[in-house]
Structure formats: structure tokens, C-alpha cells
Amino acid sequence: MKNGFRQSMAWLHTWTGLLVGWLLLLIFMAGTASYYREEISRWMRPELPSSNVSIDVAAQRAVDYLQANATQAENWFVTLPQPRNPAMQMFWRLPPELADPSRGRRGGFGDATLDPNTGQALKARETRGGDFFYRLHFDLHYIPVLWARYLVGFCAMFMLVAIITGVITHKKIFKDFFTFRKDKGLRSWLDFHNVSAVMALPYHAMITYTGIVTLMIMYLPWGVKVAYPQDEDKFFSEAFGGMPEVTAPAEGRATPLPIAQLLDSARAHWHGVEVAGFTVSNPGAANAVIDIRQRDGKRLSTDTPAVRYDMVSGALLEETPPSGGATATRGVLYGLHLARFADWGLRALFFLSGLVGCLMVASGVVLWAVKERPKHAKSGRIGFGLRLVDALNIGTVAGLPIAFAAYFWGNRLLPLDIAERSSAEANVFFYAWGGALLAAFIWPKRMMWAWQLYLGAAAFALVPVVNALTTHAHLGITLRNGDWVLAGFDLSMIAFGAMLALCGWRMQRWTPPLSAAEKKKRAAAAAAPKAPVEAAEAAEAEASA
């Protein structure tokens, strides 16, 4: 570690960023994509139509379907069509005696996806859609969830340290924000890293800190263990508890009120806020109750209000109790992280800020290699550490976009009837990334950067083509119908392809600038006295001229 406070902070900034940089880039890219997870999920299930009916009509069709197909269920769970996701999804829980033991834990549940326009069940392809990226950015993949969340929390804490030490290290950080020196080697990379860091600095700090807060009880459990030594469940019930679960068994039979009347009561209670979905306990019974959930978009907090009504009389039984100060604060911080409250403009701003964060992390790991290379050039050989970093940089910075595009290709090209299809799509993502990493380790040279960037560009740009060849929801139809969710996805793929192609072209044409030592060596060679033979040839040429 260097002497002096600022030098010490620079050392800490470098190593906290580098050691977790590649995993952090995966987390940042997956988290940024998650801002549009509903739109991604819709594109990845092209069989689902747009909703052209009101919430009340859709809810009535859901109830009609459940009354016909899940009469013996103990509970119904319904998610109504939303502006960003027109699908109407539902599942129901069966009594233990009707559960199918061959299906394990799933044997006690049924599920369906309905067309809200007709009330008919739809057969959509099995996919995780955008939820894959959402879970990936904090649960990772292939490893136990608990380990993954500890690892992601470790990376987030390192990221927070890197942000703080970066601000301390760059005393002219805001002045440097307006400075970019082109084609200056190390200086250019440092300028780019500074610009991408300062451009969205409040966002970087917010998203990192709130990411840690979302799992704070997992990372700092000791307070709960001390205050609730014998019953930790009591803590969660008191801190996050909503309405108590309905445990009373069904009693008798009765005709419920129309679902539209109950939804109107909930809207009136919330002063006009729309409904997201509902849960029915003891459907069809005289003591049936319905819990109605409020739609996201009007609150910063992730704490979703709900109200409970008697389905027969329509009486308001209870509502979600107000949160305490600490719980409300956590809910707001969690809400800032997820941005469910954002309209289309604010969501786009969050997404762009996330992309800038990806550039910041990527430029940081590349900057270390650029800075180290002249030191290795003096010795005439590249050490193992630099080769490792070069390979990881190529395989992650240039390879991850290939994996993201491959995931979308897998959604369109994998057979619709294969078992565990959603897992197969995830495997395609990691096979593509693994291939990019392997190629980078075999040949970690500058041209590998260009080749992988070009491959990523082609993969993204051809997604709309593959979509047009395999589904009916292509640009020719979506643009004509004004379906801007699906059209916007395809156009975004083309835009990402163009940006990656530009990066590949720049990398292909880029010539590393000479180091100061190399410049000095060449200048000395040019100024050295010419050899006798060369001098004679020069004199003869001059005489003949």
C-alpha cells in the first residue's frame, strides 16, 4: 500500500474494484436488464395477446374460469393484466387429500394463463423471461441461493467501498468529468472511467447501497437473534406482517357478490388507485373472503397495500396495517432499487444510468490491464496475472453481450415441448458465455476483442430476424399495430447491435500508443549517427540528385 491518505485510497479503490469487477459486471448488466423484465417476459411469450378489456371484465373472466376448473381449491390467486404485462395468470391451492404426490411440492397447486379478451386458457411457451435476469442479479445460477446472496452482498460492499474511495482519490473528479483526451492510451481510459463514474454517481451510490439494504437482515442477523432469541418468526411477523392468514375452514355455501363490485370498493378505499390482483380464501363458501392488492406505480415503497372483504356481504374486514418507521424506510429503499414506481420516462433514465454503471465497471477492469502492460513490456514478457485479467476482460466485457443475445435466440429456437425448457434457455446463456471465456483464455489478444464484439453485434442485430422467422409478432406487424412494447424490444436489439459493431470497428482499428520509454528509444534511434555504408549511400544519392 502506498504512503499518504489519498494514495492509500487509490490502492484500495483499485483492488476492491478489480477483485470483484467481472462478477460485478454480470450483476450490473442483469440488474439493468431487470428494469424491463416485464417487457422482456412479454416478448419471450409471443403467444400472449394484448389486453383490450377492462380490469373488471378480466377479473370476472378469471372468476368464471376458476369456478369451472378449481371448485375444490382452498385458495385462488389471480394476477390481473397490467399495462406492462397483459397476461392474466392464476394458480390455486388444493386440499392435501387432492394433491398429486408425484409432482412433489407442485402437486398441491394448479395454474393457468388466460387470454383476458376471451377468458380462454392459453398455452404459452415455458420461459423465465425477464425474471431470469432479475434472479440472476442477486441469486446467480447453479449455486445454492444462500451462498449466492452472500457472494453478491460481498461484491456490493466492495462496490460501495470502491465508489467512496474513488471520490476521495479524484480530488478533481467534477473537473475531470468534462475532460476526455482521445487516443491517449492510459489517459483516455482513465478519462472514460471518470466520466462514466461521475455521470451517474448518485445512481451508482444509491443502487449499491439499496442493494445491500434489501438483504440487510441476512447480512446482519445478530440484532434479531438478540432481541428474538427463541422466535425469529415473531420478528418478521411484527416487522413485515400484513393481514393475518385466513385459517378458518370453509363453512356452507353462498353466492358471492360480483367481483366488479368488490374491486370498486377497493378502488374507492384507495381513492381511485387501480387493482393489481386478488386472493380468494374458501371460494364459494359462506365465509369466503377476498384480499385485493393495490397496483404498483403510485408509491416509492415496495410495501403493497391490500384490503380484505367478505365476499358475500361485501363488508370491509381489515386492511394492511401501517408500517413502522424502520420498515417503511426499508420499503422505500427497496423500492428505489427496483423502480417499480417509475413511469416510462423515469424507467428509461434508470436503465440508461444502469448502462453507464456497466461502462464504469468495464472501463475499470480494462484500465488496470492498460496501466500494467507497460510495466510488463519492460521485462519483455507478460506475466500470468496480466494474461488472466486480459482473458477475463475479453470474455466478460465482450463475452457477456453474446450471452445475453444467445438467451433471446434460445427462446425462439429451442423446441417448445422440451422438458425444463426455461432451464434450457438459461443453459444457453451460460454456454455462450463459457464459450466466449474459453476463446479469450486460448487467445487473449487485441483482435479477440474485435471478434467477440462483432459476434455480439451480429447476435443482437439478428434477434429481430430470428423473431420474424419463428413468430407472428415481428416488426412488420407490431409497428403497424402500434404495439410499442414488442416493437421497441426488436428496435433495441438493433440499436445494441449497432453499438457493439461500432466498438468492434474501433477496437479493430485501434493502435496502442507508444509508451514513453518506446518513444524515447525511437527518438534516440532516429537521432543516432548513420552507419558509414548508409552515409555513403546517402551522399551518393545526394550527388546524383
Task: Name each model-derived stretch.
Residues M1-A545:
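Conserved histidines in hydrophobic membrane contexts and catalytic metal-binding motifs
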